[in-house]
Amino acid sequence: MFMFLSHPLDPEGYAWPGEPVVKTTQCTDVSDDCPFCSFVSELPNHCGTHMDAPRHFVKDGLSINDLSIDYFCNTEVALLEIPKGPAEGIYKEDLEPFADILSKVSFALIRTGMEKYRETDQNTYQNEGSYIAPSAGDYLTENFPNLKGVGMDFLAIGSASSKCPEGELPPDCHRHMLGYYTGKFVTGVEDMHLADVPKGAKIKRFFNAPLLIKGLDSSQVVCIAEIE
């Protein structure tokens, strides 16, 4: 069974607070005067389900177009159940029980349960999201050289919440995961649709195909999983 694990891009959808979302403008429609339908899409690259490459927070880091195909096609994938609530971080201690799994996979998907707020409570999902704390970013980048990326069912690697303590602000979280300090990085796929993946399911293959637009730091990705 194949499943989409990315959300549709929606002009009424989500981005980081204050950042723009996708806009669509219809140019033509099928009529007596025109044989075809067409649209123009204006697409900020950090709205909807998208992949943060190092260049997002590292001046000389790799961009989405610099990453090898291995970052987008995965046959060793795990779904990690790590329940978290609004403005709660994922720490090294949360990941340590999964060390054996993380050592064997190229991509890990973290399901916290925060996705439940996406359709019911925009303020909570957008402004009080969970986050990947610096200790977790360091743990991932320092210990699992085969790990290419981590996907998450919350808005972003960092949280916009004012409850985040000093040292766990959004730039801190991104920098520790994307290689700002050491050059070692794990990419992040933010704002994923993981709610419908059956608990305990084996993910045989996972694809996160990017829009290869020249010059971008990061990109939307269409995420598709084959579930056994």
Language-model features: locations:
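Active-/binding-site microenvironments in catalytic and ligand-binding cores
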Residues: 1-228
